[in-house]
From Swiss-Prot:
NCBIfam families: folE (TIGR00063), PRK09347.1-2 (NF006825), PRK09347.1-3 (NF006826). It comes from Helicobacter acinonychis (strain Sheeba). This is GTP cyclohydrolase 1. GO terms for molecular function: GTP binding; GTP cyclohydrolase I activity; zinc ion binding. GO terms for biological process: one-carbon metabolic process; tetrahydrobiopterin biosynthetic process; tetrahydrofolate biosynthetic process. InterPro entries: GTP-CH-I_C/QueF, GTP-CH-I_N, GTP_CycHdrlase_I, GTP_CycHdrlase_I_CS, GTP_CycHdrlase_I_dom. Its EC number is 3.5.4.16. Keywords: GTP-binding, Hydrolase, Metal-binding, Nucleotide-binding, One-carbon metabolism, Zinc. Pathway: Cofactor biosynthesis; 7,8-dihydroneopterin triphosphate biosynthesis; 7,8-dihydroneopterin triphosphate from GTP: step 1/1. One of its GO terms (cellular component) is cytoplasm. It catalyses: GTP + H2O = 7,8-dihydroneopterin 3'-triphosphate + formate + H(+). Belongs to the GTP cyclohydrolase I family.
Amino acid sequence: MENFFNQFFENIGEDKNREGLKNTPKRVQELWNFLYKGYKEDPKVALKSAYFQGVCDEMIVAQHIEFYSTCEHHLLPFFGNISLGYIPKEKIIGISAIAKLIEIYSKRLQIQERLTTQIAETFDEIIEPRGVIVICEAKHLCMSMQGVQKQNAIIKTSALKGLFKKDPKTRAEFMQLLKS
């Protein structure tokens, strides 16, 4: 890591021995270990240990779960919130497990589209609901800081499975719950 940063500092014309930079490689390594800890965790294990047999057959919604991730194209952050709705079949998930699932996938190099899809697919595979929907809204610093430089753009992505994909009324109910 130190060699990487020595080369980086040299390439941008910075003095690697400057007081403020002396411990930067170590600090960045610690930060990266935290930001990308999702590679060391299995999202399926997180869900498998957090569900229980349920009696609810109505829609359950977890709304505005904050996240941040890193764009794999420019290594800049993107951040926002994710809302997940599902209609149980037999399993109900602990609400904190939804946040954990989002955290595991977001703490990896990502693109928003894949993040949204991975959350929906893993949830669908492990919980086996009658339907699941994931809506992700995010701001991308790669879009704000370089290129088109649009600071207020919000990107929205969705992934739908089961009843949410097949039934427009189910989708509409979810969207109405998000508004209320």
